[in-house]
Amino acid sequence: MSRIAKAAGVALGTGAVVLSGTGMAMADAGAAGAAVGSPGVLSGNVVQVPVHVPVNLCGNTIDVIGLLNPAFGNACENGDDDDKSGGYGG
């Protein structure tokens, strides 16, 4: 087998392995765990902390907490969607 065919096979196999592990993670925004039946305050084993990470979607870039912002200088807005027109352009 030639080197190019081996390299293509390895690249295809690696891509298949990487893409097979991707998926969507979904979670609730609030933490509502409970240690039911535990005899004391410190005897439960439930620790939950709600985490809120701001994600900025601007044009065709996505930033998490604005680190190394590729959209520097673009006008973007983070806010509620108050316009309920339901369509594009007005």
UniProtKB/Swiss-Prot annotation:
Biotechnology: applications noted: The small chaplin mixture (a cell wall extract of an rdlA-rdlB knockout) forms a stable coat on a number of surfaces (including Teflon and cotton) and emulsifies oil-water mixtures, which could be useful in medical and technical applications.
Family annotation (InterPro entries): ChpA-H
Taxonomy, superkingdom: Bacteria
Signal sequence region: 1-27
Record key words, sorted: Amyloid, Cell adhesion, Cell wall, Disulfide bond, Secreted, Signal
Function (record text): One of 8 partially redundant surface-active proteins required for efficient formation of aerial mycelium; the short chaplins assemble into a hydrophobic, amyloidal fibrillar surface layer that envelopes and protects aerial hyphae and spores, presumably anchored to the long chaplins. Chaplins have an overlapping function with the surface-active SapB peptide; chaplins are essential on minimal medium while on rich medium both chaplins and SapB are required for efficient aerial hyphae formation. Chaplins are also involved in cell attachment to a hydrophobic surface.
Name the UniProt record assigns to this protein: Chaplin-G
Lineage: Bacteria, Bacillati, Actinomycetota, Actinomycetes, Kitasatosporales
